[in-house]
Each structure stands twice: as structure tokens, then as C-alpha cells.
């Protein structure tokens, strides 16, 4: 995978606040087979829209345009992306594109034990897997699925397949998994796992749940610093997590705290939904339709022009601190 030189600012993914975007989060499906209480507590229900999910060729054209404008990292998300039967073909196409140096996957892990070797062979560079509790009963209470053993086996298989580090995501929730912080610390002490705690975020369908269970990640940050954990610097394609390391631990701790005052200042990522809409912010507008420019290979220059023009309208920051989550009903539609 080669790096493509970007000639001038007009060719690059740069917004009006001079933030440069190297990272694309690409949802390839809204469908998920888990029923997490902070996202889809009633399970997935197909929408009545006629639009189908992006095809393999549409995905290739979309990522190609982002790569030509300087994007280096793609994260494949959902829903649960591995539910697509053409998931491996999608992955292989993305990894073959010039300029794309890193292809990551976010998964609930239910297929990980059986398929992780094929994922690695297809070109998945790194994996984030959701584990909201290390207690099988609490895992079931949060996810609605009795898959704890299978997911944990999948993490072990990922290391056997050659992944040197796995990122594990856990949504931090008061009165549910908040008491497991020390258990998670012990779990990563001798394992090369980056354990990432994500602050519960307010969405349109989950206001009551948010009010009941939100807990600030700052509480954990202060505890980590008191206990000798050190904050690490970020790379240009890193996500929003603040990463901490400790000399006595093999693993790392990451904190994603969207309610911090400066959370948006280092934003480096854009999102494309499974139906081909560009979303400039996780908690933003309805989305800019790209699909009409994903039909032929000779539309790349028009697609890049639309991307650049749209990016100039990206807001300086979200308004979560005001209780404004935009039009986002839940996170399954855009992959978080």
C-alpha cells in the first residue's frame, strides 16, 4: 500500500478550522445481532427505506476518494460488520487501495473465534472488540446475548492468529459495570490489551437511560494518574482515546470522554454510513448523500470536490454538553 502525495490544500481533507482528516470510519451495515441496552435494547429492526447498503464497488470508490485526499486509516464498523457475507471481499478491496496504510475492525466478537484468521489474511490490521463486562451474567444483562465465553475465546484466538495487541471497548455505566474497573485492570496486567472505557453518550432514543447511567470518565482518569499511570501522546491516525500506560502493566487503558471541553479540537475522523451518507460528526446533521457519485470509476474528481466542499461546513465542536445529540437516534446507524 503506497502513500499518495497530496499536492495542495484543495486536494486534502482539511476543514475551515484547519483540522486535517486522516481517518475514515466506514459503516457497511446497520444490522446487529446483539441487543445492547445503551444502543439497541429492543434489537435491530429494519427501516422502511428502500435504499440498500453500499455495494462492494461503491465502497471501493468511496474509500478511494478519501485515500486520494490523504486518508490513511479506515475503520470498518456497523452494526456488526462481519454479518455481511461479502465482508472479506470488502476488506480485501480496501487494503488494496493506494494510500490506505491501516484497516481496522470494530466488532462485537461473536464470530471472532472461528473467523479471525481469515480476517487477518484479508488485511485487517487491528481489532476492537466490545466487552462491557467480565462477569458473564452482567455481560448478558448489558448485551442481551449469552456470548461471553465465545467472545473471550475469540480474543485468545486473535493473539494466536498473530495480532500483537487487541483493543477492547467497554461503555462505562453507573450501577452496571462501574464496579468492574479494578477487575479490568487486573485482566490487562499481563495481557497486551488496550482496555478502553467509553463514556455513555446521549442519543435521541436513550435519554432516560443516559440520565440514569452516565458516569464521567474523569473519575477514572484521576484514579489512574494517582496510581502512577502516564498519559501518552497521539499519532495522526489515532482515535479519540486518551491512552495511559503503567510500567508494571503489559496492557494499556484508554478513556474516551466526549464531554470534555476540548474533545473536538483534535478531531481527525469522518464517517460514511452504510447507505452512503457522509457524516461530519457523530452527533451532527442528517448527512450528505454521496451515493450518486459512487456509481462509476470516472466520478472520482466530482466525489472529491463534494467531500471537500462538505467538510467546510463541519462545526467546530458538538453540543452534547447542552444535551443536543443532533438527529442521532442510536449509534448502530453510523458505527459510533
From Swiss-Prot:
InterPro entries the UniProt entry points to: Aldolase_TIM, Elp3/MiaA/NifB-like_rSAM, MoaA, MoaA_NifB_PqqE_Fe-S-bd_CS, MoaA_twitch, MoCo_biosynth_MoaA/MoaC, rSAM
GO MF term (any one): S-adenosyl-L-methionine binding
Record-annotated Radical SAM core domain positions: 16-241
Keywords: 4Fe-4S, GTP-binding, Iron, Iron-sulfur, Lyase, Metal-binding, Molybdenum cofactor biosynthesis, Nucleotide-binding, S-adenosyl-L-methionine
Cofactor: [4Fe-4S] cluster
Top-level taxon of the source organism: Bacteria
Binding site for [4Fe-4S] cluster 2: 264, 267, 281
Binding site for [4Fe-4S] cluster 1: 32, 36, 39
GO biological process, one term: Mo-molybdopterin cofactor biosynthetic process
Pathway: Cofactor biosynthesis; molybdopterin biosynthesis
Co-factor: note: Binds 2 [4Fe-4S] clusters. Binds 1 [4Fe-4S] cluster coordinated with 3 cysteines and an exchangeable S-adenosyl-L-methionine and 1 [4Fe-4S] cluster coordinated with 3 cysteines and the GTP-derived substrate.
Residues binding GTP, per UniProt: 25, 75, 106, 167, 269-271
Subunit structure comment from the entry: Monomer and homodimer.
Protein name per Swiss-Prot or TrEMBL: GTP 3',8-cyclase
Organism: Actinobacillus succinogenes (strain ATCC 55618 / DSM 22257 / CCUG 43843 / 130Z)
Amino acid at each position: 500500500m503506497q502513500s499518495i502525495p497530496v499536492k495542495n490544500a484543495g486536494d486534502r481533507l482539511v476543514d475551515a478550522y484547519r483540522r486535517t482528516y486522516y481517518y475514515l470510519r466506514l459503516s457497511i451495515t446497520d444490522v446487529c445481532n446483539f441487543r445492547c441496552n445503551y444502543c439497541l435494547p429492543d434489537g435491530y429492526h429494519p427501516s422502511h427505506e428502500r435504499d440498500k447498503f453500499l455495494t462492494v464497488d461503491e465502497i471501493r470508490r468511496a474509500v478511494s476518494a478519501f485515500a486520494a485526499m490523504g486518508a490513511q486509516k479506515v475503520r470498518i464498523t456497523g452494526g456488526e460488520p462481519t454479518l455481511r457475507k461479502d465482508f472479506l471481499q470488502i476488506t480485501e478491496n480496501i487494503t488494496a487501495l493506494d494510500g490506505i496504510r491501516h484497516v481496522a475492525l470494530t466488532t462485537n466478537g461473536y464470530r471472532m473465534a472461528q473467523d479471525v484468521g481469515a480476517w487477518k489474511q484479508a488485511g485487517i490490521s487491528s481489532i476492537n472488540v466490545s466487552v462491557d463486562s467480565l462477569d458473564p451474567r452482567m455481560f448478558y444483562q448489558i448485551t442481551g446475548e449469552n456470548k461471553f465465553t465465545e467472545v473471550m475465546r475469540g480474543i485468545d484466538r486473535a493473539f494466536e492468529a498473530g495480532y500483537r495487541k487487541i483493543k477492547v471497548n467497554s461503555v462505562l455505566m453507573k450501577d452496571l459495570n462501574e464496579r468492574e474497573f479494578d477487575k479490568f485492570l487486573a485482566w490487562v496486567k499481563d495481557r497486551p490489551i488496550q482496555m478502553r472505557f467509553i463514556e455513555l453518550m446521549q442519543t435521541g432514543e436513550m435519554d432516560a437511560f443516559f440520565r440514569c447511567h452516565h458516569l464521567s470518565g474523569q473519575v477514572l482518569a484521576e484514579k489512574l494518574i494517582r496510581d502512577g499511570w502516564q498519559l501518552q501522546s497521539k499519532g495522526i491516525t489515532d482515535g479519540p482515546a486518551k491512552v495511559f500506560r503503567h510500567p508494571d502493566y503489559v496492557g494499556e487503558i484508554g478513556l474516551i470522554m466526549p464531554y470534555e471541553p476540548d474533545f473536538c479540537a483534535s478531531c481527525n475522523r469522518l464517517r460514511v454510513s452504510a447507505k452512503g451518507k457522509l457524516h461530519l460528526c457523530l452527533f451532527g446533521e442528517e448527512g450528505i448523500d454521496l451515493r450518486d457519485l459512487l456509481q462509476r470509476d470516472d466520478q472520482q474528481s466530482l466525489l472529491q470536490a463534494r467531500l471537500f466542499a462538505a467538510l467546510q461546513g463541519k462545526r467546530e465542536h458538538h453540543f452534547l454538553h447542552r444535551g443536543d445529540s443532533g438527529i442521532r437516534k442510536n449509534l448502530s446507524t453510523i458505527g459510533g
